[in-house]
C-alpha cells in the first residue's frame, strides 16, 4: 500500500484577547459613576489617601489600573509586610489593590500611609469590604483609615451590565441586537465577576 499523501496541517492562530484596562474600555453607569469621577479628578483629590470599595467584579481593579497608569503608581497586589514596606520606601504613588482579603501588617500599612503623606504622594486602596470590617487593632492606623475619603462601587446595574456585554461582543467583532442584550441582562447574575 502506498504511503498516504501529506495532508496540509492546520496552523492554530493565537487569537486570545487580553482584557483592556484603559479609560476608553471603561463602561460608566450610576453604579460606578462616583468612583470614575474620583479617578478622573486625580490629582485634585480631597486627600492623598483614598479607598474604593465594592463587590468582586465591580471594576475596582480596572479603575485602579487607570489611576496607576496616570499617576505612575507602584502597584502592590500582594500585601505581605515586606511588599508594603518596600513600596512605602519607594517614594512613589502607591496602589494597594485587593486590600483586606487577608492578614494585614498594620504597622507596615501605617508607615506606608505616613510615607506617602510625607512625600506628598498619593495612595489608593481597593477592597471588597469597608475598612470597618478589616479588624484593625492599631489605634493610629484606625484613625488614618477613618479619615480617608471612601467611595463605594455598587452592584452592577442593568446599564453597566448591558454596556459591558455590548463592549465584549464588539471586542469580538460581533454585532448584537439591543433586544438580545436586554433579554440577557434581564436573566443573568448581577455580577461581572
Where are the predicted features?
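Walker A/P-loop nucleotide-binding motif
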Residues: 47-64
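Short regulatory helix/loop adjacent to the ATP-binding pocket of P-loop NTPases
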Residues: 131-146
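Conserved AAA+ ATPase "SRH/arginine-finger" region at the nucleotide-binding site
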Residues: 148-160
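Short conserved motifs of the RecA-like P-loop NTPase core
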Residues: 162, 175-187
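The conserved phosphate-sensing helix
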Residues: 188-193
Amino acid at each position: 500500500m502506498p504511503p498516504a499523501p501529506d495532508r496540509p496541517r492546520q496552523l492554530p492562530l493565537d487569537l486570545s484577547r487580553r482584557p483592556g484596562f484603559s479609560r476608553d474600555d471603561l463602561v460608566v453607569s450610576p453604579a460606578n459613576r462616583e468612583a470614575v469621577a474620583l479617578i478622573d479628578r486625580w490629582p485634585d483629590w480631597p486627600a492623598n489617601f483614598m479607598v474604593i470599595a465594592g463587590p468582586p467584579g465591580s471594576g475596582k481593579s480596572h479603575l485602579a489600573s487607570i489611576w496607576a497608569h496616570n499617576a505612575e503608581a507602584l502597584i502592590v497586589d500582594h500585601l505581605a509586610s515586606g511588599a508594603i514596606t518596600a513600596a512605602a520606601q519607594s517614594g512613589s504613588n502607591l496602589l494597594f489593590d485587593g486590600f483586606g482579603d487577608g492578614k494585614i501588617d498594620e504597622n507596615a500599612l501605617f508607615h506606608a500611609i505616613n510615607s506617602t503623606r510625607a512625600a506628598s504622594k498619593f495612595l489608593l486602596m481597593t477592597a471588597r469590604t469597608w475598612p470597618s470590617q478589616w479588624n484593625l487593632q492599631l489605634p493610629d492606623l484606625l484613625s488614618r483609615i477613618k479619615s480617608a475619603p471612601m467611595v463605594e462601587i455598587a452592584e452592577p446595574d442593568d446599564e453597566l451590565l448591558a454596556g459591558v456585554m455590548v463592549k465584549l461582543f464588539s471586542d469580538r467583532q460581533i454585532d448584537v441586537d439591543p433586544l438580545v442584550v436586554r433579554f440577557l441582562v434581564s436573566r443573568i447574575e448581577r455580577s461581572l465577576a
